[in-house]
Amino acid sequence: MSSTILVIHGPNLNLLGKREPEVYGYLSLDDINQQLKTQAQASNISLETFQSNWEGAIVDRIHQAQIDGIQFILINPAALTHTSVAVRDALLGVAIPFIEVHLSNVHAREAFRHHSYLSDKAVGVICGFGAKGYHFALDYAIQKIQPST
């Protein structure tokens, strides 16, 4: 497995399965990560996951992704979606293609959740499909980085 995809989970996603399950679903973050790793392995793709409640740690991991040779990033920036120019600048700085993923439909929620600092630079945005959104994003990323045979 030479190609690697990085999945970054933002603040409070460590509480998945416990925090507002009617909004975010009943799967834990570990459940989602394991499902994604299995999906990636089926295509001979390596998958790394990272979660932090700290903006700076997420920025550092994005920077490290370039050093590590990551080919694609899937990011659920959670609340940082609406506030973080730093995460936006980090993603632009490393120039790794990324997809923005949200479990809930942010456009059907509070008005402050309607703006994203990332979406205009993302390859795409997937929201409102629960954990399935990560799988949709991973399918696309695999297609983009896998050599055609």
Swiss-Prot record:
Domain of life assignment: Bacteria
Cited InterPro entries: DHquinase_II (IPR001874), DHquinase_II_CS (IPR018509), DHquinase_II_sf (IPR036441)
Pfam families listed in its UniProt record: DHquinase_II
Active site residues according to the UniProt entry: 24 (proton acceptor), 102 (proton donor)
Family membership: Belongs to the type-II 3-dehydroquinase family.
Organism lineage string: Bacteria, Pseudomonadati, Pseudomonadota, Gammaproteobacteria, Moraxellales
Pathway membership: Metabolic intermediate biosynthesis; chorismate biosynthesis; chorismate from D-erythrose 4-phosphate and phosphoenolpyruvate: step 3/7
UniProt GO BP: amino acid biosynthetic process; aromatic amino acid family biosynthetic process; chorismate biosynthetic process; quinate catabolic process
The name this protein goes by in its record: 3-dehydroquinate dehydratase
